[in-house]
Amino acid sequence: WLKDMIEKLGITSIFVTHDQDEAIEVADEIIITNRGHIEQKGSPVEVYQSPETAFSASFFGQAATIRDYHVFNYFEDIPGAEYAIVRPEFVKVTRKNEVQKYKSSASEADVERVAFRGSYFELQLKLGEVVLSARRGLDEPLVRQGEKVDVFVQRLFVIKENKVYALENSSAREDYLVI
């Protein structure tokens, strides 16, 4: 409603919010600040999909910070990487009896929590010492707390010296190359 009102009035507006979802919905341009310093600016899609700094990468959603991203299979090694950021939408979860596209590159995890969020289920998963959030649609078979599932991490942001490297799981990337 706010964006509609701004457009209807034909005014230029600066909207300050700490609600990331609201910022993405309303903005034509987003400026992410951290302690008075501009971290990144761009369209909502640019800022979300191509973060330029560690702060920008972890700003949206319920991103998990992973100290050793090598626990996930088939990602390029970035020597000297400090940590990785994994957003829930990067994580694909399948039950043990489900058909899965990337079974050889999936890892086993325990479902620690399942929360109904209206249009999806939010999962908290434990893979060794790593805790991840993931989403599962209402059209997918329900997973339960305590269940063992397969987890495929499709993408992650690796941080080295505040630079962000967006890495794709090579097993998924190679799948796209098949003709």
Map each language-model feature to its residues.
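ABC ATPase nucleotide-binding domains
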Residues: 1-52
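Structural detector for hydrophobic anchor residues on beta-strands
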Residues: 11, 65-70, 82, 107, ...
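Residues located in well-ordered beta-strands
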Residues: 43, 55, 108-112
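C-terminal boundary and immediately downstream tail of ABC-type ATPase nucleotide-binding domains
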Residues: 49-74, 85, 152
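Glycine/charge-rich catalytic "coupling/switch" loops of P-loop NTPases
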Residues: 71-114, 141-179
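Short, acidic/hydrophobic/Gly-rich beta-strand patch recurrent on exposed beta strands
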Residues: 85, 122-128, 135
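Short, conserved beta-turn/loop elements at beta-strand boundaries and strand-helix junctions
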Residues: 114-120
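Beta-strand/loop nucleic-acid-binding surfaces
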Residues: 131-141
